[in-house]
Amino acid sequence: MDPVSHAEPSARIPASRVPEGRGPEGHVAAACVAAGRVLESEEPALPLGTAPLYASAPSPEDAANATTAAAVSGPRTFAVDCGGGGIKTALLDAAGTQIGPARRTPVRYPFSPAALENIIAADAAALRAEGCDFERLTVGMPGMLRHGVVVYTPHYIRRAGPHTRLDPEMEAAWNGLDIRAALAARFSRPTLVLNDAEVAAAATVTGRGLEVVLTFGTGLGNAIVDSGVLAPHLEFSHAPLRWGLTYDDVIGEIERIRLGDAAWSRQVARAIESLYPVIRWDTLYLGGGNAARITESVRERLSGSVVFIPNAAGMSGGVRAWDLVAASERARAEQ
């Protein structure tokens, strides 16, 4: 089995987005063909010690040459990162470099599978209007998924958003749905659907030892990769932590807002310390939108035991997720 190895670092330019229809080459269509620049998501800056997924921005000529070469060598991937509050999409070249700006659409509850399909379809149509297209689709979404089937998803089955009352109609619509098959049929493209933390893991893991990825956003996401093989998904977020509360209850976004970053960060540290005796990972990565909010004092407390990764890993992993899944399937077939 060939372990998944690091892709070449992607280039990145500042978050001042290219205006609609106006790139350095004159328009978005030209950028789709040749620019290959990565546009940062609007997230808090990560401090020193962050995993080096990105290098400094190349010259326009180098970026165009690199992206053109990548486009020839592999398919373009339309990556979809599904969160409790919004759906983000971006077009990636074969190297995982973002082409043009990402798009974000707020989730409006109740949120059905058809609503997700329609958001993806609208963003795909916008790409085509700009002269772009994709050959495959990668979707990362919260919850337990097996072989593209939703076993359980925590947010979209609620009436008014995370931690609100269950909506029986949405629960029936989502849980048990073969979302991979539904999206593949809708878009007529090869489709991969994984837990969102597993997509982030694909952008991050080295294939050496037991690697764990924890993502902090609306709730807690997680992925486990053993020597380049993706382990069956476990939902740490639903496990009891203390006083009958789950990890999501204690370190999710609602609790962060209630406590403030300092107290919330201390709870994150305690949660990580409670997980280590159970898993005893070789490397732990922390990501997601709220990882950047972990305070410096807690970072120092965790220093030497964790690596921070950019929130963009949830999107950029859309390319390497295919390699991670293929390597995992080969390894299991050889057992």
Regions found by a protein language model. Name each.
Residues 68, 72-115, 165, 229-257:
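Short glycine-rich, Thr/Ser-proximal phosphate-binding strand/loop in the N-terminal lobe
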Residues 87-91, 143, 202, 220-226:
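Short beta-strand scaffold segments in enzyme catalytic cores
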